[in-house]
Every structure is written in C-alpha cells, then in structure tokens.
Amino acid sequence: MTGLGVRSSSYGSLEKTGLNGVVLPIQITTTTRTKPSKMQKDREGIVHWICKFAGRKKVGMLLLFLISAVVFLRVLYVGKGEDSQEGQGPPSLHFNGSSGVNYSNMLQTNEELNMNIGNISFKAKEVIVFPPPPIHFLGYSLPQGHPCNSFTLPPPPADRKRTGPRPCPVCYLPVEEAVALMPNAPSFSPVLKNLTYIYEEPLNRETEFGGSDFGGYPTLKHRNDSFDIKETMSVHCGFVKGPQPGRNTGFDIDEADLLEMKQCRGIVVASAVFDAFDDVKAPQNISKYAEETVCFYMFVDEETESILKRERGLDGNKKVGIWRVVVVHNLPYSDGRRNGKVPKLLVHRMFPNARYSLWIDGKLELVVDPYQILERFLWRKNATFAISRHYKRFDVLVEAEANKAAGKYDNASIDFQVDFYKNEGLTPYSVAKLPITSDVPEGCVILREHVPISNLFTCLWFNEVDRFTSRDQISFSTVRDKIAAKTNWTVSMFLDCERRNFVVQRYHRAEQERFARQRPPVPNFPPPPPSPPPPVLISSDLPRKMSSGRATPPRRRGRDRRSGQRGHRKANLPVRLPDSA
C-alpha cells in the first residue's frame, strides 16, 4: 500500500503518508456526492411521509403557518429583551475568531431576569397610574318642589306717583342652606388655565394712545393679542411697577394690611370711598357666621380717613362696624372715579387667595347676607361672573349719548371711544344677540368667582378703562363679546330690580350736605305760657240764653238739619184709617 492514501474517517478525505510514517493531511476539493447522514435521512423521510398524505397546497399552508409562528415567537422574544434592557446600550456582538456568534454575554441569569421583571412591573405602574383629573364645580339644582323653583316675579305695584326703578322680590335660601351649598371646588375655566400678569422694570411708555404708569402702556398689538384666548397667557392687569400689588406699585397698602388680605381665603366683600365722596355705610342683616368668615374691606384715602376719625371714631383697630378700613397711599390717578376702578375690577390681584368676591359701590348699603346673594346669583346659576343690567338702557350707543347729555365725561373722549369700537364691529343691541339680554350693565355691584377666565375678563376690562374713558359701561360689552367669541364663557346678567333688593342706594355726601343746607332751620323759640282755663259755656251745642228768657235749641249741623227735615216730611204723610176702607 506504499504510495496509496489511507482513507480516514473524515468523510472521504485521504491522508498522505510521509516520511518516517508521518501522516500528512491532504485537503482535496471534490465534487463527488457525499453519503447523507442518518439524521438527514430521517428528516427527508418525514418530509416524504407528509407529502404522501397531504397535497402540495396543504403542505404550503403548513409551512407558512410554521414560519409565521417562528417569526411571532422571535418578535416576542426580542421585544421582551428590549424591555428588560431599557436604559442600557444595545448589546454588542462579540466574535472570538470562530465561525459562530457568542451569545453568552447576552443571556441573563435567573436573578437578573427576576430583577428586570420587577423593574418592568414598576415602570408599568408608573405609566398606568395618572394623577386624578382636576375636580370642578358643575352646579346643582334645588330639590323638586322647592318654592324657589316655581317663584315668579309679581307685577309691579300700580303707583302712578312712583314711576322710577324699584326693588322686586327675590327668592333667597336661608343662610344655613346657602352656606351648605357653597362649592367645594372651583368652577371650570374654558380654554384659559394659567394666567400671569405683566410688570415692567423699567416702564415702557411707548404706545399709540392711552395707558398710565399704573396700568402700563400696552400697544394695540398687545391689546389684540390679549383677546386671543390661549391655555397660558400673560397680560397687563395694573400694578405694572412691581411683582407684588400694593408694594411701591401705586395704590400702595401698608404691609400689615397686605398680610391680612392674604389670609382671606373664602369670600371678600369690598367697597371704596375716595375724596370723601360718600359716607361709610354699615351692612345690615348680616348673619353671625358671615361676620366671622367673610372678609369685609373698605378702601379709603387719607382724606376720607380723617373724616372717619372725626365722625365715626376710627382708631388703631381699623374697624368701622364690620368693615376693616384700609388706607391707600400713593393713589395712581388724580380722578377719584379712576382710583375706584382698582379695587372694583382688580380685587383678585389684591386678594390672591380669595375664592369669591362681592363688590359694592361706596354709595350703596348692603342689606342681605353675602352667602344668600352668592347662592342666588352665582352658585345656583353655575356662573363665574354676575352683574345686573341697566334698568332702562340696553344699547351701548344709547348709553354713550346719555353719558354725554349728563356731562359724565368729556364728550370728545366718549365719541373717540365709541368710534373706535364701531370700527371693530360694534353694532346696536338687538334680539339677534339673545340669550345676551343687554349690552349695558349697572356696574355698581359685581359678583364673581376668582377663576382664570373671569380674572382675565376684569383685567381686560380695566385695560379698556385705563386706555379710554373711565365710564366702564361703554367698554363692558366689547370685552365680553371678544372673550365669548373665543370661548363658550359669558356673563350672567340679572334684573336691576333684583339688585335693588339686596343693596339700597344712598345719596352722596355732597348731596346730603346740600339737602341739609336747603332744609329751613327749626326756630328755637321759648315754650309758650300755659293757656288760661276755658269759660264754662263756650260750646255751640248748649242752649243760649236770650234776652226774652227763652232758650233756643242749639244750631244743628247740615246733616242733622237734613235728617230732621226728612222726619218732618214723614210725619205729614197721609195716614189711611180702617173706616175709610
């Protein structure tokens, strides 16, 4: 066998015998068909067996099913592996010089697998568990059969001597029921969720027209942008000189008063008297619970403070009745009417933690409990802003002419404001605006909830008053309609006679003094001396003694004389005797 190759067990390869019996491997590439292994024969037999009992179509469907199952299991396995390796880099493939891939570094031990499963479940909890949605007040209805559900206004009394506006009945709930119905959650604010306020340092005074150092000088572009309602907004809203209202911003308030105002977290009743224009009027019919829980704040200037000290005994406790008197320094305007617009429209900035506010002008006297008022006109209506409409006028154009006729403001300024609104689309009021019942409010009373959308409304309303005239009745409908065009929010307007039910209008201080001067003084005469005793016979009913000695009967009055004559005529009637029959 010298010179012949020895067949080895390497599936047909030959070994070359070298010198000294050393066998050298010879790598020969052959094209001859190798003998199939036993395992391969078994697989081929299974395939032939399947093909024998099933047709080609069924075999194809079976293979397609198997391939789909393999792909599905593979995707499931890969997806699970990605979840378990979240937060880590992608696994790298390591080659150690062999023809295969080493997956040993990619396999996980049981401990690692359990740890990853725990992490996966924890992360799944984080994804599934969301914070609860904000809870909003959705309104309520009084129980069926409640008297207020069927309450209707009676017709006005027919009094020709009194033709002006007058109060009408209102169906209030008892104080205890009104307190129980106070909402525990804020009302929904459409579109607007976050509202912040602009302050400028230094102050930019460049604008087209209008504005002030207190309210800022927003341009017309800023004005238009403020009516584009978004989820988050930042607008001018007074106090532009600093981030804290009342601290070196104009309309400055003592620090002790500011701290007390921050503690008001429920209802605040606010009013103001500047330039000693009115007397401070004590609220009436206020429940003990309201006195303890409602904040009553009266804002005055230094002139009014001096009068209160002299006439009402205002001292260090800063109280006049249930009013807490707050003295305002560094007033931003020379016109007292403009200064009064600050607490009237920006009360939410001065009381940042209050939920509800009731504003009444200084000329008014509150005569109904605040809880009853808010329940009737705000909570029961599911409204966030309520104001009474004017008792007579519904059209802004008519209201502007009435202001000009009464000399309420400079006529040229009123005309300029009305023309500006007309160019923006202001039209006379008509039934086409229903359910809006009026374009002219009676702004001496404002009921509101401090939510973002109502706060925005009063901010933009104040900006109009700051830019144009101080007659807020003229700018009210423009601001309301611009906000309503972007949201489904609007203002609730109730009857003027209903407003007159819970506030009583008094005369201004100057009018009271004028009436006092016109009233004639009462003469201070000494008391008259006592009258002498009457004579014995002075009555005309007693018989009078005549000179002849005869007594004449007393003179009869007209009625007695007529009755006597009737009796005499009856006596002269003929009498029919029985014999004459």
Curated annotation (Swiss-Prot):
Q: Pfam families from the xrefs?
A: TOD1_MUCI70
The main location is Golgi
EC number, as in UniProt: 2.4.1.-
Q: What happens when the gene is disrupted?
A: Strong reduction of seed mucilage accumulation and major decrease in rhamnogalacturonan I (RG I), associated with reduced absolute levels of rhamnose (Rha), arabinose (Ara) and galacturonic acid (GalA) but increased absolute abundance of minor sugars (e.g. galactose (Gal), xylose (Xyl), glucose (Glc) and mannose (Man)). The double mutant muci70-1 gaut11-3 is completely defective in seed mucilage production and exhibits a strong release of minor sugars in total mucilage extracts.
Task: Name one process (GO BP) from the record.
Answer: rhamnogalacturonan I biosynthetic process
According to the UniProt record, one GO cellular component term is: Golgi membrane
Q: Which domain of life is it from?
A: Eukaryota
Q: In this UniProt entry, which residues form the Lumenal topological domain(s)?
A: 80-581
Tell me the tissue specificity.
Expressed in siliques and seeds.
Q: Where is this region: Disordered?
A: 514-581
Which parts pass through the membrane? 59-79
Q: Where is the composition biased (Basic residues)?
A: 553-571
Enzyme class, first EC level, given as a word? transferase
**InterPro entries (UniProt xref):** TOD1_MUCI70, TOD1_MUCI70_glycTrfase_dom
Glycosites: N96, N102, N119, N194, N224, N285, N382, N411, N488
Q: Which residues lie on this side of the membrane: Cytoplasmic?
A: 1-58
Copy the pathway line from the protein's UniProt record: Glycan metabolism; pectin biosynthesis
MF (Gene Ontology): glycosyltransferase activity
Q: Which UniProt keywords apply?
A: Glycoprotein, Golgi apparatus, Membrane, Signal-anchor, Transferase, Transmembrane, Transmembrane helix
Where is this chain compositionally biased, Pro residues type?
520-536
Bilayer disposition of the protein: Single-pass type II membrane protein
Family to which the UniProt record says this protein belongs:
Belongs to the glycosyltransferase 8 family.
Q: What does this protein do?
A: Probable glycosyltransferase involved in pectin and/or xylans biosynthesis in cell walls. Together with IRX14, required for xylan and pectin synthesis in seed coat epidermal (SCE) cells. Collaboratively with GAUT11, essential for the accumulation of seed mucilage, a gelatinous wall rich in unbranched rhamnogalacturonan I (RG I), and for shaping the surface morphology of seeds.
Q: Which PANTHER family match?
A: ALKALINE CERAMIDASE-RELATED (PTHR12956), HEXOSYLTRANSFERASE MUCI70-RELATED (PTHR12956:SF38)
Write the protein's name. Probable hexosyltransferase MUCI70
